[in-house]
Amino acid sequence: LLNFYNTLKQLGFNPKHIVDIGANHGTWTREALQHFPDAYYTLLEPQSWLKDSMLDLLEKNDKINFYPVGAGEKNGSFNFTIVDRDDSCSFRYTKEEAEREGFKQIEIPVVALNDLLLDSELPTPDIIKIDAEGLDIEVLKGASNYFGKTEVFMVEAGVVNKVFSNSFLKLINFMDENNYRLFEITDLNRPFTPNVLWLVELVFVKKNGFLDSKIIS
């Protein structure tokens, strides 16, 4: 991730508005702030109780806005499953799956980014980061207004992971169809034994956009 941020700065990319979907405790935003301290930040996190871990950011920086909601393709209220780790809680589980595993479910509001930012006076997002525990494509569909406008999308994709619907292949094809090119891989996630490649974190940039045009083949 550090290499990617350094590349952005070397290419003269200066984002004015950054969206963090699945902000959790704000760790990703904290790192982004070190590189882009003057940007506006819009944070979405369905676990409203995690806001307390970000109060220091929210209280000292009025350019950071926090929304205690999930992001998806459409607006509504959906069952959110609470699991052992707060960074793995998800809208992905069915009622039956949650009951079988002994997990609690609560109903939480979900918004499409298209609607959340519809009347916003903030600049169009330059970077949209998505960590949606396997539902990244649904979130992207709800952010379709920004295809062709937002320069950078950062998303997760499953590799060996058969649970996530957003496989590497599906995500590459989806972004290609919407005129985005794979630009960087910022993380290779190997959390289990055997040490297989479970997830990757990918960066896509707009085809023929600012960043894509800077790379000379």
Where are these regions (language model features)?
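Phosphate/nucleotide-binding beta-alpha loop and adjacent structural elements of enzyme active sites
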Residues: L1-S217
